[in-house]
Every structure is written in C-alpha cells, then in structure tokens.
Amino acid sequence: MLIPSPDPFASCPGYYLPDFEPFKACTNISNFCNHARDVYNIEMLLRWAIFIIPCCMSFFALFLNIYIFYVLIPNLRKMNGRSKKKYIFILSRAVSASMSILAIFLLPVIIFLTHFNFWVIALFIIFEMLSFLSFIGGMVGTTLTIYIAVVHPMYYQRELSLRKCVLLILLLWVSAITVAISCGIVEAAFIGRNSPFSCDYGNCAGPVLIFGIVCIATAFSICLVIQLYVIISLWKLGIQSTKRGDYSSTSKALTGVKRKLFAGFFVFATMAIFEIASAIILVRSVSEQTQDLDACDKLSASTSRLQFVISCVVLTLLW
C-alpha cells in the first residue's frame, strides 16, 4: 500500500494558492513556505499594484481629463489667436495624458485577457511610448512658447502665428510616432514565437531594455535641458529688469512664470530620476531571469522574481 507523500505547503497558512499544485513534487526546494510567501506576494502585487490601484487612479485621472476637454475645447474656439497659441499646447498635453491613462488600462488587459505575442506587446509599447513622447513634446512646446513670449515678445506677437504652432505640434507628434514605432518593434523583439526577429529571451532581454532606457533618458534629458535653459534665460532677464529699476506688473508676472517653470522642472527631474533608476533595477533583475527554467527552478528563484515584479510595480505606479 502506497503512503501518500505529505503536502509541503500544508504548514503555510495564508500563502497557499491553487497555482502551487505543480510544485508539490519538487525535490530542490528546502523551505517551501518562504517560496510560497514570495509567490503569494507576487500574486498580490500583480493584482493590486499593477491592476486595481492603477485602474482606480486612472479612472480619477480620466474624469479630470474629460473635464479639461469639456472646459478647454469650447473656450478655445472663443479665444483670440494669441491665447490659442498657448492653450493649443495644453490641449496636446491633455491628449497625451489621456493616452497614458488608456495605456495603463491596456496593461492588465494584455496580462489577464490575451496571450503574450509579439504584435500585442509591440502595439502596447508603441501606444505607451507615443503617449510618453507626445507628452514630452507638449512640455517642450509649452516651455519654448513661454520663452519666446517673454524674451522675444514682438516676434511672439507678429511672427509666431497659430498656424506655426499647429505645425510645430504636428511635427512633434510625427516625430513621436516614428520613434514610438521603432521602440515598439525593437523592445518586443524577444516576445512570442511569431516575432519577426530570431532572438531569444536570454540574449535579447538585457540589450533591448537598455535600448529602451536610452530612449527614455534621451527624451527626459532633452526636455530638462530646454527647461533649464529657459529658466536661466528668464532669471538673467529678471536680473536685468531689476538693475533697470523695473518693478512693473510685467516684472512681477515674470517672477511668477519663473517659479512655475522651476516647480515644473523640479517635479519633472524627480520623475526622470525615479523612472530611470527603476528601469536600471528592472534591467538588473531581467539579467537574472530566464524563460527556460522548469516549474521547480522557477519556484526556487522566487525571491529574485519578486524583486523583478517590484521593479515593474514601481515603473507602473510612476507612469
């Protein structure tokens, strides 16, 4: 008579999941409960930090964006050409923010409702990168418009027409689409068997993610350099106005503009630091992963996989 082997997860209350059934026969595991806790934490992080919390935040942000469109679009039609030149960039940024929200909704849909394959992942990355790059472009356009309006007011009034602003926005969007498509195709190179590239996970994951970090860091750097240049230029202009004894309302307005730009620069720089740092941690975690492990090897590597998921969570919440 065969004696059934004891359940190694029986002494792990609160951590047991139905997914543990394939791991009961593993012989290379010494402490099942520790690994069960890691797998349970991974499941909870995926459920709450990548699905429920981002979706709740996105619903709130989506309502705010709908309100912005509801208020901005009718008023934009009533504005004169000078005001439209400023708010057309704000409208572009609102579109980018809405795309970012939709990208957050797409992530759990891809994870839970579809099979991972090259075209699905590439489409998601393209959409996400397009929202990010178009947002960066909107920030750059708004900052440059403020710079021209303050430093070169005559050119802003006479030469910088609404048509030129629209053409600039179209140029930024076309550039964002081009870069996003390139990033989407490259970053999804090792996903699925139907990928047009013969590149396996172990060889491609690290270089592809490094390529993504370079693209993101370059976009952040361009925007931050332009913001810093405008802040320094306005600061010098303010010093010159003070030396001339100019204490008019225009000078006070310049001080307010500088404060807003500096606050935006600080927030954007903080976001860039955390985004790039989290991406670097993600690359280090990916370098330790492999898709060729069997179920028991995957369970034994649960700690490193938990760190990998935490990196993904940080990136998701930051975005």
Curated annotation (Swiss-Prot):
GO MF, one annotated term: G protein-coupled receptor activity
SUPFAM superfamilies assigned: Family A G protein-coupled receptor-like
Keyword terms, alphabetized: Cell membrane, G-protein coupled receptor, Glycoprotein, Membrane, Receptor, Transducer, Transmembrane, Transmembrane helix
Membrane spanning residue stretches: 49-69, 107-127, 131-151, 166-186, 206-226, 261-281
Residues bearing carbohydrate: 28
Entry's Gene Ontology cellular component terms: plasma membrane
Main localization (coarse): membrane
Subcellular location per the Swiss-Prot or TrEMBL entry: Cell membrane
Keyword NADP: no
InterPro entries for the chain: GPCR_Rhodpsn_7TM, Put_GPCR_Chromadorea
Membrane topology: Multi-pass membrane protein
Gene3D superfamilies the record matches: Rhodopsin 7-helix transmembrane proteins (1.20.1070.10)
PANTHER family: G-PROTEIN COUPLED RECEPTOR B0244.7-RELATED, PROTEIN CBG16518
Family to which the UniProt record says this protein belongs: Belongs to the G-protein coupled receptor 1 family. B0244 subfamily.
Name of the protein this chain belongs to: Putative G-protein coupled receptor B0244.7
